[in-house]
Amino acid sequence: MLTENSAVNSGGKSKCEAGACESRVNGDATSVMDLMAVSTSATGQDEFDRNAPRICGVCGDKATGFHFNAMTCEGCKGFFRRSMKRKASFTCPFNGNCTITKDNRRHCQACRLKRCIDIGMMKEFILTDEEVQRKKDLIMKRKEEEAAREARKPRLSDEQMQIINSLVEAHHKTYDDSYSDFVRFRPPVREGPVTRSASRAASLHSLSDASSDSFNHSPESVDTKLNFSNLLMMYQDSGSPDSSEEDQQSRLSMLPHLADLVSYSIQKVIGFAKMIPGFRDLTAEDQIALLKSSAIEIIMLRSNQSFSLEDMSWSCGGPDFKYCINDVTKAGHTLELLEPLVKFQVGLKKLKLHEEEHVLLMAICLLSPDRPGVQDHVRIEALQDRLCDVLQAYIRIQHPGGRLLYAKMIQKLADLRSLNEEHSKQYRSLSFQPEHSMQLTPLVLEVFGSEVS
């Protein structure tokens, strides 16, 4: 049996005894175990308060966790393990009741070991050398398996990453989410005489709000909650002969502002397109054909960034630039466009696309080889296929369980085609009316006012 005694100084007293060997100060019990009990009492007997300071039950030093069935520091953990493995026997030269602290814990090993046992440390929890080695081998095996799984995960190639980074950068450079340029447009005009058309438009917005509330409480069915059939009935007599010119002017009071907004957005879409990898390699004729045919679809995709499910509106900065359905009706648009537009925005918002997915979808939308007026179908299709491959690879990595996400995104492109057709038809109708076409910008008239030849 190994015996290790504490050193005694020339005065006959150990450093431990000369130090703070008393366990009570001024008659108050302040042991480490008392402090631990106080720190854990708020969370119950079986739950340790993670926010409370962890204190070693042996010496009061900062604890690193439970070791051998007790909360201890690394030093006392090692001391207990060594003592048990060596089957050491220590003798206290004093009364066997030394107070163990961080500073004097090396001075009386007997009382330190006794304290370890008193707080519940058990030698049965100590692993043998063979068990330690098996544990190390198991940890190493798990690390190797994790590394192998990581190596098997699908990864984007450098080229695919470069494409995504280019598109994200292009979007950031051509989409100002502060909407600071909106103050340069002709100002929005929402007020005017309360005519039948304005009243119907207000009802449209009111019912949209009701639909929004229903959607928030029951998001499982967009089609049933966003019921526009009642709204359509309100507009049955919108073109009746007794509609006055004043009524018509009030109904289109937002046309100048929204025409400027769309014209501005078209310019930004052009800037975005020029930064899509491969777009500038196309002929000028194909670039123009693609832009004229897809511009409004890209604008609708981008506008989803400002669309709110709470009130079915587009918030573009201050209150003057918060657009509701009522505002869109005052630019000459009807329910044939607004109903599918709002449903599209809601559905797209619910997909919760990453920014990378959003910009890829815009680029795929723009590079559609079946657009009217396109000449080099093969080349454009190759560019689009490459982007589709990147999108699918990204989805596989970021959404391992989202097998249907890609299909849902492609379906949104089909929805955009229908919206595009109706939007162009309504804008062409406006362009044929001199009193309204004069409010449109030349760029808007060029893109929406005539068919692509």
Swiss-Prot record:
UniProt note on tissues of expression: Detected in embryo 24 to 48 hours after fertilization and in gastrula.
SMART domains, A to Z: HOLI (SM00430), ZnF_C4 (SM00399)
PROSITE patterns assigned: NR_LBD, NUCLEAR_REC_DBD_1, NUCLEAR_REC_DBD_2
Motif segment (9aaTAD): 442-450
Subcellular localization(s) per the UniProt record: Nucleus; Cytoplasm
Binding residues annotated for calcitriol, in chain numbering: 175, 265, 302, 306, 333, 423
Binding site for Zn(2+) 2: 92, 98, 108, 111
Ranges for domain NR LBD: 159-449
Annotated DNA-binding residue span(s): 53-128
Domain of life: Eukaryota
Binding sites annotated in the UniProt record for Zn(2+) 1: 56, 59, 73, 76
SUPFAM superfamilies: Glucocorticoid receptor-like (DNA-binding domain), Nuclear receptor ligand-binding domain
Record-level GO cellular component terms: cytoplasm; nucleus
NR C4-type zinc finger locations on the chain: 56-76, 92-111
Gene3D superfamilies referenced in this protein's UniProt entry, alphabetically: Erythroid Transcription Factor GATA-1, subunit A, Retinoid X Receptor
Family membership noted in the UniProt record: Belongs to the nuclear hormone receptor family. NR1 subfamily.
Function: Nuclear receptor for calcitriol, the active form of vitamin D3 which mediates the action of this vitamin on cells. Enters the nucleus upon vitamin D3 binding where it forms heterodimers with the retinoid X receptor/RXR. The VDR-RXR heterodimers bind to specific response elements on DNA and activate the transcription of vitamin D3-responsive target genes. Recruited to promoters via its interaction with BAZ1B/WSTF which mediates the interaction with acetylated histones, an essential step for VDR-promoter association. Plays a central role in calcium homeostasis.
Assembly with partners or alone: Homodimer in the absence of bound vitamin D3. Heterodimer with RXRA after vitamin D3 binding. Interacts with ncoa1 and possibly other coactivators, leading to a strong increase of transcription of target genes.
Name this protein carries in UniProt: Vitamin D3 receptor A
Gene: vdra
